[in-house]
Amino acid sequence: MPYGKIEDIKTSGASDVTAAQDGLKEGGWKSSHRMAEIDSNRMENYRTIINEAGRQCDVDPAVIAGIISRESRAGNQLINGWGDHGKAFGLMQIDVTPPPNGGGHTPVGTWDSLEHLIQATEILVEFIERIKTKFPRWNADQHLKGALAAYNKGEKNVESYASVDAKTTGKDYSNDVVARAQWYKSNMGF
């Protein structure tokens, strides 16, 4: 995969705030792994389309699974495919809020379709390219982690690698997604 090697990325995992949403006592990568595990049965339902979206977009399927787990808990937090009070769509929660406050994306496919996963993964790839341009000295793993933060809050909010999650939801988005993706890679073979 040209966009970093998820299993090699250092991560602190979920924040205490994110972990508490699942009744977990403290944050960290163990809590991220536990949340990924909780979502694993639902995630299995999407394995085929996750793998296909990864293949078509040349993105590690484990990264896609990590985003799905964080964004929608593998669909469990969606109402008719919508989340974030109607501002985000699908398993990967693409932002439909008009710019400048949102991504302004028009959803493609149904909320749980291959078309949706390809659209959302292409958005991630676009953020990878923007982060590469913004931070040309970063390595591929750093670009991926920065792009994950940008997927959540836009590339303008990624100011340095040391503070990659400073402006993300829970101040942990990329670290949590990386840890969840690592769990899916190791335990479900994504």
From Swiss-Prot:
* Active-site residues, Swiss-Prot/TrEMBL: 71, 84
MF terms in GO: lysozyme activity
- Keywords, A to Z? Antimicrobial, Bacteriolytic enzyme, Glycosidase, Hydrolase
The chemistry this enzyme catalyses reads: Hydrolysis of (1->4)-beta-linkages between N-acetylmuramic acid and N-acetyl-D-glucosamine residues in a peptidoglycan and between N-acetyl-D-glucosamine residues in chitodextrins
Q: Which EC class is the enzyme in?
A: hydrolase
EC number assigned by the record: 3.2.1.17
Matching entries from Pfam families are given as: SLT
Gene3D superfamilies attached to this UniProt entry: 1.10.530.10
Q: Name one GO cellular component term.
A: extracellular region
Q: Where is the composition biased (Basic and acidic residues)?
A: 1-10
Q: Name one GO biological process term.
A: killing of cells of another organism
Q: Does the keyword Hydrolase apply?
A: yes
Output the InterPro entries linked to this UniProt entry. Glyco_hydro_23, Lysozyme-like_dom_sf, Transglycosylase_SLT_dom_1
Top-rank taxon: Eukaryota
List the residue ranges of the region (Disordered): 1-31
Q: Give the record's family classification.
A: Belongs to the glycosyl hydrolase 23 family.
Name of protein: Lysozyme g
